[in-house]
């Protein structure tokens, strides 16, 4: 696999994209840093060039605001967790439709080994995908699956039509991932998106997503990082203490894991695991759900 890290000084800024989309460069920077470790959890040769200087600036600012390296560790754990989730769906269960909602600068189409005939759909804003395509094209990267981009705003009611036009078959099994998005949306938008996903998925299809709890908004040590996000135009808006209830309302049975638990540690989580029964703490949830 070609190493594209020498292009770190390029900046694939999606002109016209909103600030939520810009957080994807922070995630790419975290993946790039992880990829440089000898004990890396994954290898993402495209991450550094996609992050650009702005992405590494995001990462530095978020870690400074948090007073720790958790803003760089959490994306790494989340990435590996959902890598395993997606590959299990395709390799063990035989799913051949993968949908990345708000794909941002995700590179799974290029760095994971997909089974033959896998179709991977990346949905995001036109400006985000255009800038990403330009950077990937310059890197001469080639996907390991059939990759289709769907340039549309997920907050527009008509986005499902764009996905269907690209060949997605809702009557067939699929696996979806909504990663790094719901925290930034209004409650009504979260429910609308989940309901649209339900309407587009067959029974037993799978959905992965991440959530924050409500306690994050009321925990003073977390306020500096929340303020840093707000200054960059990406304030947190949504949290839930009961992901299972949220998903059940839209027809999904959810299995919920916290970073630090077995299966979501990978030797990267720096804090002791605290059970959900202990109140008053901020929490993040990694959710694997099935359309029931």
Ranges and model annotations:
Residues 1-99, 103-150:
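Rossmann-like AdoMet
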Residues 137-170:
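S-adenosyl-L-methionine
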Residues 147, 157-161, 184-199:
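A short, conserved alpha-helix within the catalytic core of class I
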Residues 168-189:
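A short SAM/SAH-binding and catalytic strip from SAM-dependent methyltransferases
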Residues 218-233:
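Short, glycine-/aromatic-enriched active-site segment of Class I SAM-dependent methyltransferases
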Residues 234-259:
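Short alpha-helix
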Residues 267-292:
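Core SAM-dependent methyltransferase catalytic element
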């Amino acid at each position: 696999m070609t190493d594209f890290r020498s292009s770190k000084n390029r900046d694939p800024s999606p002109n016209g994209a909103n600030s939520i989309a810009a957080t994807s460069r922070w995630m790419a920077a975290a993946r790039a840093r992880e990829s440089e470790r000898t004990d890396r959890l994954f290898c993402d040769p495209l991450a550094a060039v996609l992050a650009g200087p702005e992405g590494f600036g995001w990462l530095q600012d978020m870690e400074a605001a948090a007073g720790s390296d958790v803003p760089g560790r959490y994306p790494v754990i989340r990435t590996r967790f959902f890598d395993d989730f997606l590959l299990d769906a395709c390799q063990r269960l035989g799913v051949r439709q993968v949908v990345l909602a708000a794909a941002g600068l995700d590179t799974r189409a290029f760095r994971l080994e997909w089974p033959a005939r896998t179709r991977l759909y990346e949905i995001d804003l036109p400006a985000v995908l255009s800038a990403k395509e330009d950077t990937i094209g310059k890197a001469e990267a080639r996907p390991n699956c059939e990759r289709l981009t769907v340039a549309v705003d997920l907050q527009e009611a008509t986005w499902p039509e764009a996905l269907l036009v690209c060949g997605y078959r809702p009557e067939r099994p699929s696996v979806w991932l909504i990663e790094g998005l719901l925290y930034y949306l209004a409650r009504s938008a979260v429910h609308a998106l989940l309901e649209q996903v339900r309407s587009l998925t067959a029974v037993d299809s799978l959905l992965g997503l991440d959530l924050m709890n409500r306690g994050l908004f009321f925990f003073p040590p977390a306020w500096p990082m929340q303020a840093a996000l707000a200054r960059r135009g990406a304030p947190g808006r949504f949290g839930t203490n009961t992901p299972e209830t949220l998903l059940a309302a839209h027809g999904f049975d959810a299995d919920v894991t916290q970073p630090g638990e077995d299966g979501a540690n990978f030797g990267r989580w720096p804090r002791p695991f605290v059970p959900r029964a202990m109140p008053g703490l901020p929490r993040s949830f990694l959710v694997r759900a099935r359309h029931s």
